UniProtKB/Swiss-Prot annotation:
PANTHER family documented for this protein: ABC TRANSPORTER I FAMILY MEMBER 17, IRON EXPORT ATP-BINDING PROTEIN FETA-RELATED
Catalysed reactions listed for this entry: phosphate(out) + ATP + H2O = ADP + 2 phosphate(in) + H(+)
A cellular component term, taken from the record's GO annotations: plasma membrane
Assembly information from the UniProt record: The complex is composed of two ATP-binding proteins (PstB), two transmembrane proteins (PstC and PstA) and a solute-binding protein (PstS).
Entry keyword annotation includes Nucleotide-binding: yes
Binding site for ATP: 58-65
MF term (GO), any: ATP hydrolysis activity
Name of encoding gene: pstB
Similarity section: Belongs to the ABC transporter superfamily. Phosphate importer (TC 3.A.1.7) family.
Protein name as it appears in the record: Phosphate import ATP-binding protein PstB
Originating species: Shewanella sp. (strain MR-4)
Length: 272
């Protein structure tokens, strides 16, 4: 089994199957997804708690990133993608035809595997989303930039070079800048798709510490191939296999006393 420092883990008292509406950030109901004739997700249902870190784990191709991208409708951009089922945010199905997808993506931010800063200054990267919303007041932008860079634990490293090109930052700094850009528009939910897979161990540790801080303000959902990382940063973990949600429970249970044989086999390295 993966070794977990139980003294460092927050005890999760949530009954995930019966999570109250007040404690639920997102509810996924009977979600199926197909790319043409190929089905990638099969009847996935789960509730994701507010202001917690939920990790999706599983072998390559299991559907964890596909599921993550459903939460802010990034799969809309994929040809021949068809989705059945519901994802509820504030009790409303985000796949309802009346939903403003741009507004949804402002409320459900996403950070990808590789840092993707824009070819702009550090400052302009952070305030980009605010400018798109028509905010141009300099004081308001300055305050948002500092707040977001502090929130992404990078302010002290960049405060004296805000107008330098973002490409001059290290990989780890660029990823924190991208997180700052995502939280500048104050989303409720932050999706992280393998956010440290392209980073060195020191930068990875910094991002993991940041994730722990982010959950005080945001609901965080992370996809990771690194089981130790899931054990370190998440409050609950969902194990996926071949497009199905096999087991979903508090992280301590998943990594120490999983209920399903497939979960145990994956955690113990019998396949993956």
């Amino acid at each position: 089994m993966i070794s977990i420092d139980s003294t460092a883990m927050k005890t999760n008292n949530f009954d995930l199957a019966n999570l109250s509406q007040n404690d639920t950030a997102l509810e996924i109901r009977n979600l199926d997804l197909r790319y043409g004739d190929k089905q990638a997700l099969f009847n996935v249902s789960m509730k994701i708690p507010k202001k917690q870190v939920t990790a999706f784990i599983g072998p390559s191709g299991c559907g964890k990133s596909t599921l993550l991208r459903c939460i802010n409708r990034m799969n809309d951009l994929v040809d021949n993608c068809h989705i059945d089922g519901e994802i509820l945010l504030h009790g409303q199905n985000i796949y309802d035809k009346k939903i403003d997808v741009a507004a949804l993506r402002r409320n459900v931010g996403m950070v990808f595997q590789r840092p993707n800063p824009f070819p702009k200054s550090i400052y302009e990267n952070v305030v980009y989303g605010l400018r798109l919303q028509g905010i141009n007041n300099r004081r308001e932008l300055d305050e948002a930039a500092e707040r977001s860079l502090r929130g992404a634990a990078i302010w002290d490293e960049v405060k004296d070079r805000l107008h330098d090109n973002a490409f001059g930052l290290s990989g780890g700094q660029q990823q924190r800048l991208v997180i700052a850009r995502a939280i500048a528009i104050e989303p409720e939910v932050l999706l992280l798709d393998e956010p440290t897979s392209a980073l060195d161990p020191i930068s990875t540790l910094t991002i993991e510490e940041l994730i722990t801080e982010l959950k005080t303000k945001y609901t965080v959902v992370i996809v990771t191939h690194n089981m130790q990382q899931a054990a370190r940063v998440s409050d609950q973990t969902a194990f996926m296999y071949m497009g199905e949600l096999v087991e979903y429970a508090d992280t301590n249970t998943i990594f120490t006393t999983p209920k399903k044989r497939k979960t145990e086999d994956y955690i113990t390295g019998r396949y993956g």
